[in-house]
């Protein structure tokens, strides 16, 4: 059996972490007794279609009769199936000033035997010192210290941003729960709860006011979410999505119709334009283009009448220079770069080739 005393300043997320534990207990089929006003259909892991959601709403400031009325939380010996009791604002009725009341001692005796009755207990209080010493030493097995990340400031960096922007460094709203084994802040840390809980904000009344008037907060058992919300909810099946699609289509039909006509007109225009371009390309005089290309190639490939001006060979390297009738010199490596092939028979007989062009070059010219 685990007893947690959840502590923290105002707005630190004490109730939020307790509600998350309530959700976990309900999700695995356990029983919950609490003085919180819960909205069961807003629990994400429970949902509005849950038919067996066992929750007991006890008085804001429960007495021994209220605790005895909830019965047992677990009939088996498996403590993982224990029920959960969550009591908020314990500082108003679980403190040393009210503990002199004779009706308080039977309450602490009941909580001492809660394990045998199959209950885990969570007390929510702003500070552990507000709880009576006798109850604190007897019941405070674990103490949870809640902190909020967005209320902290990063040293140095936070100060620089505050000076430059005139505001605090915005940090995410993340809640930390540091679980200590015992009521001493220096006790061993046994666990750390890190959570955001944004999906649980709507699951309980954050503005609930606790009162000692039992007529304003009588015990009762809330009805399962299925019978209050699920039975009236619209089933989101294939018919639902088809119906929603038709509704949105009717709202947007004019816009869709206009966009469809624009797209159709653009598509037809591109189609006819591409056909015109293809017809123009197919009607071009292919023969004349080939003739012009051949003529141009021959013109480029043809060389003036050449003669061998010099011939030098060192091993496999041959360097030849040619000369035309005007005395212009042509070097063999330049001709080879231009695509000409040199067929050397001897120093006075060389053949130049490029495509269909052939010229026999000799020493005499």
Curated annotation (Swiss-Prot):
One of its GO terms (molecular function) is ATP binding. It is found in: Host membrane. It holds the Pfam family Zot. ATP binds at residues 8-15. Disulfide bonds: none annotated. The chain crosses the membrane at residues 255-272. It is a single-pass membrane protein. GO terms for biological process: viral extrusion. Coiled coil: none annotated. Signal peptide: none annotated. GO terms for cellular component: host cell membrane; membrane. Keywords: ATP-binding, Host membrane, Membrane, Nucleotide-binding, Transmembrane, Transmembrane helix, Viral extrusion, Viral release from host cell. InterPro entries: P-loop_NTPase, Zot_N. Gene3D superfamilies: P-loop containing nucleotide triphosphate hydrolases. Interacts with G4P; this interaction results in a complex that spans the inner an outer host membranes. Isoform G1P plays an essential role in phage assembly. It is required to increase the number of adhesion zones between the inner and outer membranes of the host cell. The extrusion of neo-synthesized phages occurs at these adhesion sites. May be involved with G4P in creating zone through which the phage assembled and extruded. Belongs to the inovirus G1P protein family. This is Gene 1 protein. The gene is I.
